[in-house]
């Protein structure tokens, strides 16, 4: 009974790490896990983590019961949240434009525009 009460009456955000990658996992409308990439990248051997996330840290802002979060890449401004690669960059997907968006969550909308027209999501 207590578990049911906690699961549905309180909004909880679990902060985890150590995987050297970024992910946000929504368990239900009230529970979310934020797994934050490592500031050391891949153990200081590379300036990116295993998922392409740059070295950096997670930021969390709490105001009452509202939680906002972002990922701050080392050496970049706070709004630096993705890298894109032109078609032909990948041998496996030569016709595709590739976007690596870190700290993404299900509420984000990521679109590709050309001359103001949405070309893909």
State the predicted function of each range.
Residues 95-104:
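Short edge beta-strand/loop segments characteristic of extracellular beta-sandwich folds
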Residues 105-114:
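Solvent-exposed loop/turn segments flanking beta-strands in beta-repeat/beta-sandwich domains
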Residues 2-90, 109, 118-120:
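Conserved beta-sheet core of the metallophosphoesterase superfamily
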């Amino acid at each position: 009974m207590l578990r049911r009460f906690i699961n549905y009456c309180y909004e909880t955000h679990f902060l985890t790490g150590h995987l050297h990658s970024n992910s946000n996992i929504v368990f239900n409308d009230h529970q979310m896990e934020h797994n934050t990439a490592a500031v050391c990248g891949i153990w200081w051997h590379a300036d990116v983590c295993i998922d392409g996330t740059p070295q950096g840290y997670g930021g969390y802002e709490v105001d009452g019961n509202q939680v906002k979060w972002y990922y701050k890449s080392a050496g970049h401004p706070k709004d630096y949240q993705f890298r894109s690669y032109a078609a032909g960059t990948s041998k496996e997907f030569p016709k595709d434009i590739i976007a690596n968006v870190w700290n993404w969550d299900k509420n984000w909308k990521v679109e590709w525009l050309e001359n103001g027209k949405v070309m893909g999501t």
